[in-house]
Amino acid sequence: TGITPVGKVAWEQGLPTASYKESRVNGQQAKQLTLNADTVLRTGLMDGLELQLGWAGPTWTQVKHTGQTHEEDGLGDVSIALKKAIDLNDDKLSMAVMAEAILATGDDGFTVDDDIYSVGSTVDYQYNDLVNTSITMRYEVQDGNWAVTAVPTLGYKIVGKLSGFSELVYRKAESQNYQYQLGSGLIYAL
């Protein structure tokens, strides 16, 4: 829920995120492993409002199906977002809302195919100077189909301007199975 101060830039570089999915293709089991590392640049536009520019980054995928292994790699989509802090008049509890557009600019096989527009909110609780927890709820639409995502996160300070996060991503889209992902990353404030 933190907002980058006006005139400052924060660079969020995600550590490689792994996702694993099993499915059935033509009655045969298929296993897919994906590794991805994303980047977000944040800058303050005015007090309590920031601009975020993101890139889904490089991605590697391995699919095992009918005894064969197929690997691919490519570059992901870009995103633009505005995030607004909501003043709750509380020293430990904070909230922010965000509107985002993910633009389908990535390589074939590594893009969302159609642009995604979303709104979301995050509530964060700061336990102490070193640890915080948060929950993010996001509602999105892509080509007329809706989805909801919930992301509980644990944040921790490492040293100086370096901090980290670990998160569980739960997503449910129309006519799709539930999706789960684990992620972690580092944040270095410039």
Residue map of PLM features:
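Transmembrane beta-barrel domains of Gram-negative outer membranes and organellar outer membranes
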Residues: T1-L190
